[in-house]
From Swiss-Prot:
The keyword Zinc applies. The lineage of its organism: Eukaryota, Amoebozoa, Evosea, Eumycetozoa, Dictyostelia. SUPFAM superfamilies: Cytidine deaminase-like. Belongs to the cytidine and deoxycytidylate deaminase family. This enzyme scavenges exogenous and endogenous cytidine and 2'-deoxycytidine for UMP synthesis. The active site is at 58 (proton donor). The gene is cda. Keywords: Hydrolase, Metal-binding, Zinc. This is Probable cytidine deaminase. It comes from Dictyostelium discoideum.
Length: 147
């Protein structure tokens, strides 16, 4: 993301926090996902009394984008209200993000200070489509060897 895109995404992520549904944790998270063609999709965390049904802000943004046909991303910005530390995506959101490639992940505090990383750096040893392709190719080779 260039600086102008980053600033727009920070604005969008921080502004979206007001819509978070977090009656249990009171921990508002906003996300802004930038597509390769410059469109921004926002997301917020949506909690549920059955905690396992809660969805994070990042996955909300990803599903909004994908449901409208976007699958190529430049970056995602994740905003929280914590002043003393950066909040990074949870493990599920990290795995969800790498499905769409290696792109920038920016975590932002209320004062707009940032921590920058990438989907691949945040999930070392990641499991991806390449692993599934490698397994299919291995199975095909083994099948041919048996015939």
């Amino acid at each position: 993301m260039n600086q102008e895109e980053l600033e727009k995404c920070i604005d969008a992520a921080q502004n979206s926090q007001q819509y978070a549904h977090c009656p249990y944790s009171h921990f508002r998270i906003g996300a802004a996902l930038l597509t390769s063609c410059g469109k921004i999709f926002t997301g917020v965390n949506v909690e549920n009394s059955s905690y396992g049904l809660t969805i994070c802000a990042e996955r909300t943004a990803y599903t909004k984008a994908v449901s409208e046909g976007y699958k190529s991303f430049k970056g995602i910005v994740v905003a929280s209200d914590l002043k003393d530390r950066f909040i990074t995506p949870c493990g599920a959101c990290r795995q969800f993000g790498v499905e769409f490639g290696d792109f920038e992940v920016v975590c932002v505090k209320p004062d707009r200070s940032t921590f920058k990383s990438s989907t691949h750096k945040l999930l070392p040893g990641l499991f991806s489509q390449e692993d599934l392709i490698a397994k299919a190719e291995q199975d095909e080779r083994e099948c041919k060897a048996q015939n």
